[in-house]
From Swiss-Prot:
Disulfide bonds: none annotated. It comes from Pseudomonas fluorescens (strain ATCC BAA-477 / NRRL B-23932 / Pf-5). It catalyses: NAD(+) + (deoxyribonucleotide)n-3'-hydroxyl + 5'-phospho-(deoxyribonucleotide)m = (deoxyribonucleotide)n+m + AMP + beta-nicotinamide D-nucleotide. Transmembrane segments: none annotated. The active site is at residue 124. The keyword Mitochondrion does not apply. Belongs to the NAD-dependent DNA ligase family. LigB subfamily. One of its GO terms (biological process) is DNA replication. This is DNA ligase B.
Length: 556
């Protein structure tokens, strides 16, 4: 578990183009203070208790956001930023734990590698850092990382962990730095993420008593031998001889950027026995241990895996009304990139979820991809200090029988009805989508769901964008609807789901059914039956049935 604060050194250029918020100074002061306080809470839990309350990648982005806001508003008061305050334990490390510089992207990695030789790559194991001390080959003490200078005594728990050798093959004095991790089988980071593995180990180590079952799940990855041989290859071989073989298995020489990229991709997508969140690049040779300090050195750097989550600022909250009257909150966000995709909006699914999350413009939220393709909101990371009042559409005003005309407030649901009508689930009208329907509605050519049945060439000729060729193609597609069978027309009009009921018609036969008749059909319960009865009796639907009857559509 390496310190987080050093991320700013390498991420600053990457975010240099971030836009400044349009805030007056008092608002900026409030927002900066709120973000700094949140970071302090995370730091306290991470360094003092060993528990991570937020994903590292979100922490990194939040800390970079703080830096950006401070640069945008230099006149805002600035509090002292001390991430490691209160993190230290009571025991001084014989040799400090260094930090690690985090490289933001491929360009940063290329720059770091330039002019260096004898570089090695290792997985950046996602666990908790520990110092192990041996005297004459006997295990003597284990210390938590703490603030890098002072740590807590973990010796009692360490005696329970089988992965920590208690007696070495040779009577040597030894100080090692490494990672205690949760053992995982065939763990693929790209697929499963970190599974809160670090939190579990940190929680176990913080207890007064570690159970045998918990101890058996903890592994050890030694990533440094400060007073060991001069080169990493020598250190790896001698560590293996002493019983610490895992570092040798997961250390690979890097000849240039292509090698680093290859190992990063392989360890991200291949099975490993632990969670990892990137790769470590380290020079084989480094200064004497007496010169080490608790800060990021020049001889180690981290290249994190692609973001699984990004921090996004909410621009506004919109509400989409669908064909059935369902109201879906949508967050318009400052554009962010995930898996090479730019994301500008994300759905919250339901009004209930939006209300429970209480999201307003200015909130900072975590976004990921569900199934590697669909943007998903994971959590609210930081709430704006200005809580705007947002009034969503009234749920009672929208339902499966509302908005059959584009009257004020009904435009969106009505357009959704038209789009459904021409879709593959409806009449399957070629070359007709929401944009075409919107243009016809905006120009007043369509004021009801079936007005398009009487459209002609002359009417289309007066609409910008409809030339002779496109008008002819549109009319041919609309005319093809007349040959569609009765059941497809019912679905196009928006009949509620009807299970496996026979919808072959005619209309009158279906309209005569009562609730019990519908419930006798497979897959239809009382609630759905009531909706079907209401559909066939609704005045607006009866008007559509009359229009289709007059147009000679079969079944009506």
């Amino acid at each position: 578990m390496l310190p987080r604060a050093v991320v700013l050194l390498s991420l600053t250029p990457f975010f240099a183009q971030a836009a400044c918020p349009d805030w007056p100074v008092p608002r900026a002061t409030d927002e900066i203070t709120a973000l700094q306080q949140q970071l302090q809470r995370w730091d306290s839990s991470y360094y003092r208790d060993g528990r991570s309350l937020v994903a590292d990648e979100l922490y990194d982005q939040a800390r970079q956001r703080l830096l950006t806001w401070r640069q945008c508003f230099p006149q805002a008061p600035r509090a002292m930023d001390q991430p490691l305050l209160g993190a230290g334990g009571s025991i001084r490390h014989p040799i400090p734990h260094t930090g690690v510089e985090k490289l933001a992207d491929a360009n940063a990695v290329t720059g770091w590698l330039k002019g260096r030789d004898d570089i090695w790559a290792q997985p950046k194991v996602d666990g908790v850092a520990v110092t192990l001390i041996y005297h004459r080959g006997q295990f003597q003490q284990a210390l938590s990382r703490g603030d890098g200078v002072h740590g807590h005594d973990w010796t009692r728990a360490a005696w329970q962990i089988e992965a920590i050798p208690k007696r070495l093959p040779r009577p040597v004095d030894l100080l090692l730095q490494g990672e205690l991790y949760l053992r995982l089988e065939q763990h693929v980071q790209a697929r499963s993420g970190s599974l809160k593995a670090r939190n579990r180990v940190a929680g176990w180590m913080a207890r007064k008593q570690l159970t045998a079952a918990e101890a058996a799940q903890i592994g050890l990855f030694v990533w440094d031998w400060p007073q060991g041989p001069a080169t990493l290859s020598e250190r790896l071989e001698q560590l293996a001889d002493l019983g610490f073989a895992e570092p040798r298995e997961y250390s690979r020489p890097v000849g240039g950027f292509a090698d680093a990229q290859q190992w990063r991709a392989r360890w991200y997508r291949s099975p490993l026995p632990f969670a990892s969140d990137g790769i470590i690049l380290r020079q084989s040779r480094r200064p004497a241990a007496e010169r080490w300090q608790a800060k990021a050195p020049y001889w180690i750097a981290a290249w994190k895996y692609p973001y699984a989550q990004v921090l996004a600022s909410v621009r506004q909250v919109d509400f989409r009304i669908g064909r059935t009257g369902r109201i879906t909150p949508l967050l318009e966000i400052e554009p962010v990139t995930l898996d090479d995709r730019q994301i500008r909006r994300v759905s919250l699914g339901s009004l209930q979820r939006w209300r429970s999350l209480d999201i307003v413009p200015g909130d900072q939220v975590a976004i990921s991809l569900a199934g590697l393709s669909i943007p998903r909101l994971d959590e609210v990371v930081l709430r704006s200090t200005l809580r705007q009042s947002i009034q969503p559409p009234r749920e009672a005003d929208f339902h499966f029988l509302s908005c059959w005309q584009p009257s004020p407030g009904c435009e969106e649901q009505f357009l959704a009805r038209l789009t459904w009508l021409s879709s593959k689930q409806g009449l399957n009208l070629q070359n007709i989508g929401s944009r075409t329907w919107a243009r016809l509605v905006e120009t007043g050519r369509i004021k009801g769901l079936l007005d398009w049945l009487t459209l002609d060439q002359a009417e289309l000729a007066n609409i910008a964008g409809f030339g002779d060729r496109s008008s002819k193609r549109l009319l041919e597609s609309l005319h093809s609807a007349r040959q569609q069978p009765f059941p497809r027309w019912l679905k196009a009009l928006g009949i509620p789901p009807s299970g496996s009921a026979d919808l072959s018609g005619p209309w009158q036969a279906l309209a005569m059914k009562n609730s019990l008749d519908w419930q006798n059909e497979a897959g239809i319960g009382a609630e759905r039956a009531a909706q079907l009865v209401a559909f066939f009796r609704a005045p607006e639907v009866l008007a559509l049935q009359g229009a289709l009857n007059s147009a000679g559509i079969e079944g009506f």
